[in-house]
Each structure stands twice: as C-alpha cells, then as structure tokens.
UniProtKB/Swiss-Prot annotation:
A single GO molecular function term of this UniProt record: DNA binding
GO terms classed as biological process: DNA-templated transcription initiation; regulation of DNA-templated transcription; response to stress
Matches recorded under Pfam families: Sigma70_r2, Sigma70_r4_2
Keywords noted in UniProt: DNA-binding, Sigma factor, Transcription, Transcription regulation
Induction field: Forms an operon with yhdL and yhdK, maximally expressed during early to mid-exponential growth phases. Transcription decreases during late exponential growth; positively autoregulated. Negatively regulated by yhdL and yhdK. Induced by 5% ethanol, 80 uM paraquat, pH 4.3, the antibiotics, inhibitors of cell wall, bacitracin, vancomycin and phosphomycin, heat shock of 10 minutes at 50 degrees Celsius. No induction was observed with pH 9, H(2)O(2), monensin, and the detergents Triton X-100 and Tween 20. Induced 3-fold by the beta-lactam antibiotic cefuroxime.
Known function: Sigma factors are initiation factors that promote the attachment of RNA polymerase (RNAP) to specific initiation sites and are then released. Extracytoplasmic function (ECF) sigma factors are held in an inactive form by a cognate anti-sigma factor (YhdL) until released. This sigma factor is involved in the maintenance of membrane and cell wall integrity in response to environmental stresses including salt, acid, ethanol and antibiotics stress. Partially regulates transcription from a number of genes including disA. Associates with RNAP core under all growth phases.
Family as reported in the entry's similarity comment: Belongs to the sigma-70 factor family. ECF subfamily.
DNA-binding region: 127-146
PROSITE patterns: SIGMA70_ECF
Residue window of motif Polymerase core binding: 30-43
Name of this chain's protein: ECF RNA polymerase sigma factor SigM
Record-linked Gene3D superfamilies: 1.10.1740.10, Winged helix-like DNA-binding domain superfamily/Winged helix DNA-binding domain
Deletion consequences: Strains insertionally inactivated in the sigM gene form aberrantly shaped cells that swell and lyse in medium containing high levels of different salts. 70-fold increased sensitivity to the beta-lactam antibiotic cefuroxime (CEF), double sigM-sigX mutants have 130-fold increased sensitivity to CEF. Also sensitive to other antibiotics.
C-alpha cells in the first residue's frame, strides 16, 4: 500500500482523532500533516495488516510531542462524554447540562484515562488496537478503561451530590 492510498483511506479518521484531542481545527490539520510526513518517512517499518493502529500511533506521538513542546492542556470532546452517560439521561436539556459538567471533570482525569476513553468510545477501536496505540497490554488497557469509567462516574456523582 502506498502512502497516497493510506492517506486517502485514513486521512479523515486520523483528522477526527487529532481534532478530538486538540479541539482546534488548525492544530489538528498541522498535526495531520506531521503524522503523514512521519508515516512517509517510516513507511517501510509498519505491518501492512495493521495500518490503522500504526497510523493512530504515529498521530498520537505527534500530538504528544506537540503537547510536550507547548505545555498545552488538551481536553476530550463533548461527544465522547455524552455517549458515556447517554443511557442515564432522560431529557435533552439534562443531557446538555451533564455534558458541560463532565467536560470539566475530564480535565481532572489522568492523561492515560482520557486517552483510553477517546480511543475506545470516540474512535471505536477494539481493545487490541487501542492497547497497541497506548503501548500497553490488552489486559492493562481493559483495566485502565475500567478505572477511567469509574473515576469519571465518581467525579460526576460527587458533583451531583454536592449540589
């Protein structure tokens, strides 16, 4: 598979992944270019059967490098937060309120928890693909994802009980 074919096939997915992490269209576009530049340079080193996880790993690394360089706090998208609690929400007005509150709680989660939630719920990667991107075992990923859900729910419930 050529870099052009990879770009055409995965550009939108990688862009949405980066946009969900950066919340900035221009930054996501810059990181998308950086991702495919890195992919072009290292195209010989990936497993052709695992293009998507490899590309997401390259994008994740480009994002991490950017954050380290700029020391910028990045939050997760409202779409993911809403999806985590959609079964518990009854009215649209209540759903908007919960999304706003949960957005604040996401900043209190460790980076690996936010990343696990993003990869699994927003990017809809399976355990194996997401664990590969995070460079952890599948069992460890499941554990991180479980703890992330529990922590987010606890933060939400604590806030509800404080009111």
């Amino acid at each position: 598979m050529t870099i052009d074919e990879i770009y055409q096939m995965y550009m939108n997915d990688v862009y949405r992944f980066l946009l969900s992490m950066t919340k900035d269209k221009h930054l996501a576009e810059d990181l998308l270019q950086e991702t495919f530049m890195r992919a072009y340079i290292h195209i010989h080193s990936y497993d052709h059967s695992k293009v998507k996880p490899w590309l997401f790993q390259v994008a994740r690394n480009a994002f991490i490098d950017y954050v380290r360089k700029h020391k910028k706090e990045v939050t997760i998208s409202d779409d993911l937060i809403g999806s985590l609690f959609q079964n518990a929400v009854q009215s649209p007005a209540h759903q908007v309120e919960i999304k706003e509150v949960l957005t604040g709680y996401m900043s209190e989660l460790p980076d690996n928890y936010r990343e696990a939630l993003t990869l699994y719920y927003l990017k809809e990667l399976n355990y194996k693909e997401a664990s590969h991107i995070m460079n952890i075992s599948e069992a460890n990923f499941k554990s991180v994802l479980f703890r992330a859900r529990q922590r987010l729910k606890a933060l939400y419930n604590r806030g509800v009980n404080d009111e």
